[in-house]
């Protein structure tokens, strides 16, 4: 039987598959004892928003259901997740940015930018619910796989600010945790498995600074790459002898070898995949099985 009301369709296709047993549209004998009623505008609890508005303003929910749904967004690989990772990646993207340089909109999402420990912008993807005396916030920090769910009654308009303040408080601790994990996974001296001569062969030194991964030494098949690419006149002469690693996806990076005044395009644009060898981009680096791979040079390194 095909549902002919929004509430029945939502129950069949969303609530039941996700196990959301605390979400509904009007109070009934089963859920009445769990409904939070404000002292002001209390009548809105009993309003039936009908099919026209039930999907946008007439749904009640519980903190437990918010958490269940948020977990599927934070980890699309969970068995109960309805949306695969590639859909989530495309969905959680800004569509338009406002002139304040702090707020943006996406497909459904209300996006606010905060700063991490290194003054870099971090996007918080939110969906806020506001009635006369009901407030809700469903907010996700995508990069850190961390979310905040908040429900309250009352007419105060501080719910969204409370959620953002939680993110701001947590951000420094998440930054430190991430930096420690990144150091454990990637930082150090990488060399050929049987290499004994430190002046020949191939080796890479990777460090973590200001929350980013950097290559401070890059020798491939006996050639000091950084002494060539970072001191070329076309790149503005001698520059800092280190290059950043730009994350593409899990354990895969591009070396940001950069471009200088000789090009008129954005440096990040022209720095990507500027050449190929052996069928691979020359700036491609990836980690697999505890080894560092630079396929364009045919080099596989282990950490010393």
From Swiss-Prot:
Function: Beta-lactamase-like protein; part of the gene cluster that mediates the biosynthesis of strobilurin A, an antifungal polyketide that contains a key beta-methoxyacrylate toxophore that targets the complex III of the mitochondrial electron transport chain. Strobilurin biosynthesis begins with construction of benzoyl CoA by step-wise elimination of ammonia from phenylalanine by the phenylalanine ammonia-lyase str11, oxygenation by str8 and retro-Claisen reaction to form benzoic acid, which is activated to its CoA thiolester benzoyl CoA by the dedicated CoA ligase str10.
GO terms of molecular function: hydrolase activity
Keywords: Hydrolase
InterPro entries, A to Z: Beta-lactam-related (IPR001466), Beta-lactam/transpept-like (IPR012338), Beta-lactamase-like_AB/R (IPR051478)
Organism of derivation: Strobilurus tenacellus
Domain of life: Eukaryota
Biotechnology: The structure of strobilurin A was used for the development of the major class of beta-methoxyacrylate agricultural fungicides since its beta-methoxyacrylate toxophore targets the Qo site of complex III of the mitochondrial electron transport chain and prevents adenosine triphosphate synthesis. Compounds such as azoxystrobin (Syngenta) and Kresoxim methyl (BASF) are among the most widely used fungicides worldwide. This class of antifungals are used as effective treatments against a broad range of destructive fungal plant pathogens and make significant contributions to food security.
Keyword Chaperone attached: no
One Pfam family recorded for the sequence: Beta-lactamase
EC number, as in UniProt: 3.5.-.-
Designated name of the protein: Beta-lactamase-like protein str6
Family as reported in the entry's similarity comment: Belongs to the beta-lactamase family.
First-tier enzyme category under EC: hydrolase
Pathway, per record: Mycotoxin biosynthesis
